[in-house]
């Protein structure tokens, strides 16, 4: 599933994990607890959740989410290929801070980009067009919004197709979408945010079985993890997802890559006996730099 970064072994199309943390980042602002102290000086890289998709044949790369860490994420992504453009497109899931605010770095105060394609659903498009400073990016041609629609295929290269789909989430400013990323040989789901699997009009087990990789919302490990009513910030707990897949084969479980970890989530600990036991069941935990062939 994973492959070496030695150049001659690299496939032509692949996904790169560019971040695995919830919107607020790691360490979390204002957190003085052990969760944000004991691992802070480790060698682990924990950027806000994002994926890169690269096609070496067409010499193109795409970003999924424009996070506050976008500058460092694009620097890492661009190490894999050479192109005259910094990125060939950005796909946004929704209007929460960790998923779109990195667009600001395409503006005149930073890159001063020219017409970077930004793929957005209708409500997200309207949100960006109607609010400053985002509409300045459009007015100055720093970005070019490309409207996409539920379940409609988008061909981004000769070998790659993207399919957006909606998921239930706190849609204060925009709809929330996930993406299916389809390569010539393998495919992946990317669902960094959803309220609960039971609220979706699709069966998550069936959807995972239909792909090779599934990057799934794992914001919290279990109930009671934070000192606030967790129904205010609904997400499927990792323990809930594991329970849903408990009767599935290790091959199915191995498709799952948990992602989008809150700072309190023990999944951020690289050495933890509980996490190790879950890995032994077949599950994966997304780590910066992971690469998976398409």
Positions of PLM-derived features:
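A short, active-site helix/loop in glycosyltransferases that binds the activated sugar's phosphate group
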Residues: 123-133
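A short helix-to-beta-strand connector/capping loop
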Residues: 11, 114, 138-144, 157-160, ...
